[in-house]
Amino acid sequence: MKIIQEIPERNIIKLIPENLDDLWHLSNIIQPYNAIYAVTERRTEDKGDKLRADRGTKRRVFLGIKAEKINFHEDFNRLRVSGKIIHAPDDIPIGSYHTIDIEPLLQVSVQKNWKKWDLARLKDAEDSSKKPKVVVVIMDDSEADIFLVREFGIKELASIKSGISKKLDYKQNEQAKFSYYSDIINSISEYEGKILFAGPGFGKNNIQNYISEKHKDLAPNVVIESANHTGKSGLSEILKSGIIDKIYGEARISKETQIIEKLLEEISKKGLAAYGIESVSNAMNYSAIDTLLLTDEYLRRNRRTIEELMNNVENINGNILIISTEHDAGKQLKALGGISALLRFPIE
């Protein structure tokens, strides 16, 4: 995320989302009644062509709308914000409806009553754009699963079978092995930065040797770690371990996974944790909340009613973490009601 300009006297921040992660951050920042300004396409009717059967022509115009609906479309790489027009050229009626499609590299101005957690989220997005992509290959001698670890979830890039079999002779298995390695390399070659290989057995070590010999340019970026499982279970193991943070710097999804693990541990021993709105609100009455945990879904559904609680947490110097339901940690928090807290001290 690029922050272009801040205009405090008007509560406006001009910014440019640079990737899908930034759009996801924006989907959690923009809320109903916020004003959004951007260059967008609007179909307008030509004054001299009212008898034509078509719906007019599209042209690019600078519009402002008051947000009513905010929809993040991962598959289409865009964030759609719909609402009534509040600023437009003279020939476009104020009060009519419009949808602004926010895509990477589109400059957007957001006008709202900025909260501390909104600004913290913008800072997170700005910092994360400077970090390399996190690519993890979980593999053994039979199969490799390749994942892109994003701010809001996991994308499986490829699942590759080795073709190695006891039914094949040595030469055929060697050919299958090198073809397997080549397919893996082709799937990760477009990503810059470190590539983490992990899994049980020696498959990860063997491909490291292959890369050192055949792809010397990639060799310095290869990191090898052990994991007891393959597939998504192996990835979950890596996320919980904190290894990704050591390699790439703090990754949001890794941080979220670890903090939910801590929450579940505290709940299991009836320790420093509260979950569900009633229990969390009670903890706030004692100023006991250290970290308030919310799923992005819960916040979007309940933002107007939950803001007082969030403000109170900030007033006692507590932390607020919004967790995506696109990955396992967020789904675990959702199962707890979508809202939980880690506490400073136990309460009855």
Curated annotation (Swiss-Prot):
**Transmembrane segments in this chain: where?**
none
Localization annotation: Cytoplasm
UniProt GO MF annotations: endonuclease activity; metal ion binding
Task: Identify the InterPro entries for this entry.
Answer: eFR1_2_sf (IPR042226), eRF1_1_Pelota (IPR005140), eRF1_2 (IPR005141), eRF1_3 (IPR005142), Pelota/DOM34_N (IPR038069), Pelota_arc (IPR023521), Ribosomal_eL30-like_sf (IPR029064), Transl-rel_pelota (IPR004405)
Swiss-Prot/TrEMBL cofactor(s): a divalent metal cation
Gene3D superfamilies linked to this entry: 3.30.1330.30, eRF1 domain 2, Pelota, domain A
**Main location group:** cytoplasm
Pfam families given for it?
A: eRF1_1, eRF1_2, eRF1_3
- Keyword annotations of the record: Cytoplasm, Endonuclease, Hydrolase, Metal-binding, Nuclease
GO terms, biological process: nonfunctional rRNA decay; nuclear-transcribed mRNA catabolic process, no-go decay; nuclear-transcribed mRNA catabolic process, non-stop decay; ribosome disassembly; RNA surveillance
Quote the EC number: 3.1.-.-
Q: What does this protein do?
A: May function in recognizing stalled ribosomes, interact with stem-loop structures in stalled mRNA molecules, and effect endonucleolytic cleavage of the mRNA. May play a role in the release non-functional ribosomes and degradation of damaged mRNAs. Has endoribonuclease activity.
NCBIfam families from the xrefs?
pelota
Q: What is known of its domains?
A: The N-terminal domain has the RNA-binding Sm fold. It harbors the endoribonuclease activity.
Tell me the subunit arrangement.
Monomer.
Q: What is this protein called?
A: Protein pelota homolog
What taxonomic classification does the UniProt entry list for its organism?
Archaea, Methanobacteriati, Methanobacteriota, Methanomada group, Methanococci
